[in-house]
Amino acid sequence: MKSEVAPKDILFQTAARLFYQHGYRAIGVDTIAAESGIGKMTLYRHYPSKDNLIVAYLHDSNKLFWNNFEQITKEAPTSREKLLAFFEALQDYVLSPACYGCPFLNLATEYPEANYPGHQVAIEHKQSVRERFNQLAEEAGARQPEELANALFLLMDGAYMAARMFGSSPNSPAANVAKVARQLIDGQCGF
């Protein structure tokens, strides 16, 4: 028995791919409907507006980020090694052709207005990443955990922006993000 993908899921997957690869403002509901092969009426039945679809995509991206984070770090025995594992995986990702930057940074760039519905979702995601970095930095014995967390946060976002700007080029500024993270972590944790 063949299982079919629900139209809502097809619409969402299509929109997610298009938003990530081309941006939020560049993609309209006509493009999503055409690419998915599903009519606009069905799209609007599931997502009353493009903004609703963007917010749903951001929530899904947040869930995916944390699932990946846990998967990447679960084998690392210490908090220091969890941070290092994350940045090694980040380096691999930002240098891959599958990376188009960070969906949350991309959103904030295209919709800088604080009252935009997706803006708060992006801020909440970024704050939770900073908090997790800070927790791991404290557990790793960093002399100044908040300072380390902020530096790692900026390094991560810089790597995402480099991926968006330079693509998967080995000459990308993100090509040594894991090495720089290790220097920051080791400098703060006394290694």
Name the predicted role of every residue range.
Residues A56, E70-S96, E139, A149-L152:
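Hydrophobic alpha-helical connector segments
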Residues H119-E124, E139-Q188:
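Hydrophobic/aromatic-rich alpha-helical bundle segments in the mid-to-C-terminal region
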Residues D51-L53, L107:
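A secondary-structure capping/hinge motif
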Residues G37-Y47:
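Short hydrophobic/aromatic patch on the recognition helix
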Residues Q71, P117-S128, R132-Q135:
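Short, solvent-exposed amphipathic helices
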Residues I54-S61, N68:
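Alpha-helical DNA-contacting segments of helix-turn-helix folds
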Residues S96-P117:
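Amphipathic alpha-helical segments used for helix-helix packing
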Residues M1-H22, A26-I38, N52:
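Basic, helix-initiating cap at the start of DNA-binding domains
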